[in-house]
Amino acid sequence: MVSGKRIADVGYRLFSGSMMLLTVYGGYLCVVRAQRYMQRKKQLELAAQSENTASEIIKE
C-alpha cells in the first residue's frame, strides 16, 4: 500500500513541474511579444522614413 507521504511527494513534484512549465511558457510568450513589438516598431520607422523621403521628392 502506498503511504500518505509518498502520495504527497508525488503530488508536490507534479505541482512543481507544472509550475516550472508555466514559467517557461510565460517567458516564451514574453520574448515573442517583445520580438513582435520591436519588429513592428522597425516597420513603422521605415514607413515614416519612406514617407518623409517621398514628400521631399514631391516638394522638389
Curated annotation (Swiss-Prot):
It is found in: Mitochondrion membrane. GO terms for cellular component: mitochondrial membrane. This is Cytochrome c oxidase assembly protein COX14 homolog. It is a single-pass membrane protein. Its main location: mitochondrion. The chain crosses the membrane at residues 10-32. Keywords: Membrane, Mitochondrion, Transmembrane, Transmembrane helix. Plays a role in the assembly or stability of the cytochrome c oxidase complex (COX). It comes from the Eukaryota.
